[in-house]
Each structure stands twice: as structure tokens, then as C-alpha cells.
């Protein structure tokens, strides 16, 4: 039986940051589940960079069903965790069930991949202090406030934690995460 990886997300997550790791990890042979506050069809969004705007723009993206709710997750059944960005982490960081999941993965030193605004979740459970991370560049101060050393790079690896800035960095992010997975949490 293939090892299982959990993606935690919600409405307004960045479509590419959910679906790229979902597909890439399945290609590697992992079983991948998506968890959200409740089992429902999630509405993802697409962020883009357009001329004349000082920040990214947002449009409706894909919809995708959540396989299970946060309350249904048994962290012990999963070998790794993926935390996409978008706006979802802004409100998900207040979800107590999700906070329990995040703490369990970090307490067990399991591989965690986070991208864009995803590090807001790991900061909310005090799991970044003393670590090197990257995130969407506008979160540099948030990362420093969480005790992390912010690095503006495509992908940053600190032990079992792999972070990236945003979807343009997918290749470097997944390449580094797969190295960690092959070492710490192989498919079989």
C-alpha cells in the first residue's frame, strides 16, 4: 500500500498550489488526500501578476472536493503534509482542529511542504522559530515575527521543512520536497 500524504486547504486557496503538488505526488506513487474545515466542494482561486497593479490579482479558479474534514484526520496515518497558499491560510490558522494536525506533524518531525501564504499556518502553531524559510515576499515580516530567518529563494530546505515563495517556484519546491520524501518517507 502506498504511503499517504495530506494536503490541508480551504476555499480561496491558490488553484495551482493545491493541484500541482496533488498531481505531482500522485505521479510519484503516493496516495494524496485533501482535508478542509468540512467535506465539501472547495472553491479555489487564481492569483496572477498584471501590469499596473501593485499586488497580485485574484480570479475564480477550479473547484475540487475535500476528501475529509480536519476533524476526521488522523495525522498518524500520513507520512507528510502539504500546505498550499492563497488566501485560505489567513482564516484557516484560526481552526483548532487544523492546529492540532499541524502540531502533530511538527512534533513527529514529518516532512512538510509549504508555499506562498501557507507559512501563516505553521507560524500560528509556533513551528518556525529558529528555522530558515521562504514565503510570499510580503510575508517576510510575519516570518521574522514568528522567529524564522526569511530567505528570498525559490525553495528553502530546513530539515524536513521545505518552503517556496509562490507557484512560479513549483519546480524547485517539489524537487526539494521529493528529495526529503525519498529519504524520510518513501512511497512504500
Labelled PLM ranges:
Residues 1-108, 112, 121-130, 140-188:
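Extended, subdomain-level signal for the structured scaffold at the beginning of enzyme domains
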Residues 133:
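Anionic-ligand binding patches
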Residues 116:
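Catalytic nucleophile serine of serine hydrolases
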Amino acid at each position: 500500500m502506498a504511503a499517504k500524504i495530506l494536503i490541508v486547504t480551504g476555499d480561496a486557496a491558490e488553484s495551482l498550489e493545491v493541484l500541482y503538488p496533488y498531481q505531482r505526488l500522485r505521479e510519484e506513487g503516493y496516495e494524496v488526500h485533501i482535508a478542509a474545515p468540512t467535506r465539501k466542494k472547495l472553491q479555489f482561486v487564481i492569483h496572477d501578476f498584471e501590469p499596473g497593479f501593485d499586488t497580485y490579482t485574484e480570479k475564480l479558479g477550479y473547484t475540487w472536493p475535500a476528501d475529509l474534514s480536519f476533524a476526521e484526520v488522523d495525522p498518524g496515518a500520513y507520512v507528510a503534509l502539504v500546505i498550499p497558499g492563497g488566501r485560505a491560510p489567513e482564516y484557516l490558522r484560526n481552526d483548532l482542529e487544523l492546529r492540532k494536525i499541524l502540531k502533530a506533524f511538527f512534533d513527529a518531525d514529518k516532512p512538510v511542504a509549504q508555499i506562498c501564504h501557507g507559512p501563516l499556518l505553521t507560524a500560528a502553531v509556533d513551528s518556525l522559530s529558529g528555522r530558515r524559510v521562504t514565503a510570499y515576499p510580503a510575508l517576510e515580516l510575519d516570518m521574522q515575527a514568528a522567529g524564522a530567518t526569511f530567505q528570498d529563494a525559490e525553495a528553502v530546505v530546513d530539515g524536513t521543512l521545505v518552503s517556496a515563495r509562490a507557484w512560479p517556484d513549483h519546480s524547485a519546491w517539489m524537487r526539494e520536497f521529493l528529495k526529503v520524501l525519498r529519504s524520510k518517507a518513501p512511497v512504500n
